[in-house]
Amino acid sequence: AMAFGIGYHPAFRIPMTEGHTDYELRFSQAESPVCIATNGEGLLTDHTYYLGKNITTIPVNRALFANDSHMMVGLHSKELSLVEKDTGRSVTCYISGYPYVLIWSAPGEPQVVCIDPWQSTPRPAEGGNRWEEKPAAAVLQPGETYETCLKTTFSGV
């Protein structure tokens, strides 16, 4: 058997065009994103929290990424977009089929926003370092195949 994890880490520069500062992440339907907390090393903890309740947007600002990233679990949306609010320009990642979606930017005023659809997770802070011990590791048996892709749409409006 072959154990593995896979995820994408696309990064999008903001501002998309000079003079624009108001951005948001937009779900394709209302969500109450549950996030798994990580420690300072990016490893999973036993804690969870809500990023919001029954929301369709998340403002992109310094406060959103003050404590690093947010790993959302079990979203129902098929798409998550980074939207320049005053022009409608956007980048849309199609996240359907990915059990985890991480959003990240370096601390400070966001200059790059990442929308990361993942099939697996980092390892737990308390636990082994073997792939087979990861809670979301995929395991392929001999003769099986696995295929994935990330569809992204850029809209200049």
Segments and roles (model prediction):
Residues 125-132:
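Short, structured beta-strand/loop micro-motifs enriched in basic residues and often containing a Trp
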Residues 138-156:
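Short Pro-Gly-centered flexible turn/kink motifs
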Residues 11-14, 18-95:
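Active-site/ligand-binding surface loops and adjacent short beta/alpha elements
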